[in-house]
Design a protein with these regions (language model features):
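A structural signal for conserved, well-ordered secondary-structure elements
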Residues: 1-306
Length: 306
């Protein structure tokens, strides 16, 4: 705690930005080179689910039960202690029907199999709506902070939130986890959590800021003091939140595990960005804007005197 109280959060912004830059470079590289592993929610396809399977066949045996070479292009996962989920591409494009694949799996697993199918067109619509929901959330956040505080705070918060999105999705690309609607819900949850942490710091900065005049050194000092006043609260809150998230990641089934993974990465990135990115960006932007205003006034004075 004493060590955190002595950190120059704003003055050492180059260090914090460099750390984020390394992670962002890795994450953006993973997204650009490896891409995501989209689920059938976005690409279309069929998901076959079976529970209470007898005999505990291996995933390889389940894959071999699929007709033709469909097993080579399908994803087979164990679900819980005695269940399986098989995700296939669009079966009509492969020359099969849901009924044929379902019958083959029921014969292999000896259990009733349920199926959910999504057409490629509908999957594309879901993907578009998911992107629109994230964009709308970011736009509403900018509007809210601009009204509640001022635009400089909104701009700094937006930088931190975009940082969190890229880090979260980058880790998804690195580990190859499936990106589906659960991922979108998790990203929106991360945005809300990260924004809450950032607002706490911004609100303290605004409370401590002088009413009149701007002085860069004084503003950076009060920003540092404001962060120090709430930094332990942010860390304690994050740690307490991550404990059940880790439990979900370890013990949860596939859907809960995917959700928990996004929360784990996103909350960690959000806590870091709220403390080490948002406030320094705010101070740098205010200094840049003050410099522009000062330069404009000097040019106006020189023009008036000449």
């Amino acid at each position: 705690m004493v060590a955190l109280k002595n950190i120059d959060f704003v003055g050492r912004w180059r260090v914090w930005f460099a750390v984020s830059g390394v992670f962002l470079l890795i994450c953006v590289g993973a997204i650009a080179l490896g891409g995501f592993n989209p689920g059938i929610d976005f690409t279309g396809g069929s998901a076959f689910t079976a529970s209470e399977v007898q005999g505990s066949p291996s995933t390889a045996e389940v894959r071999e039960a699929l007709p033709g070479d469909l097993g080579d292009r399908s994803i087979v996962q164990s679900v819980g202690e005695d269940g399986y989920e098989v995700r296939t591409p669009v079966l009509s494009e492969e020359g099969y029907t849901d009924a044929e694949v379902r019958q083959a799996l029921e014969e292999e697993l000896g259990a009733e199999v349920s199926v959910t199918s999504i057409s490629p067109t509908f999957g594309g619509q879901i993907r578009t709506q998911a992107l629109q929901s994230v964009a709308a959330a970011l736009a509403i956040i900018v509007l809210f902070i601009s009204v509640r505080f001022e635009f400089s705070f909104a701009m700094a918060a937006m930088v931190a939130l975009i940082h969190d999105i890229f880090i979260t999705m980058g880790f998804y690309a690195i580990v190859g986890r499936e990106v589906n609607l659960v991922t979108v819900v998790a990203v929106l949850t991360v945005l809300g959590y990260s924004l809450y942490d950032t607002i706490i710091i911004f609100d303290r900065i605004r409370e401590n800021a002088p009413e009149a005049g701007y002085n860069r050194q004084r503003y950076e000092e009060l920003a540092n003091n404001s962060i120090r006043q709430v930094v332990m609260r942010s860390i304690y809150t994050s740690v307490c939140t991550l404990i059940p998230v880790v439990a979900l990641l370890i013990f949860g089934e596939s859907t809960l595990s995917d959700f928990a993974f996004a929360l784990l990465v996103g909350i960690a990135a959000g806590t870091y960005s709220s403390i080490f990115i948002a406030a320094p960006v705010l101070c740098l932007y205010k200094a840049w804007r003050a410099g522009r205003v000062g330069s404009g006034r000097r040019r106006a004075a020189q023009s008036a005197s000449s």
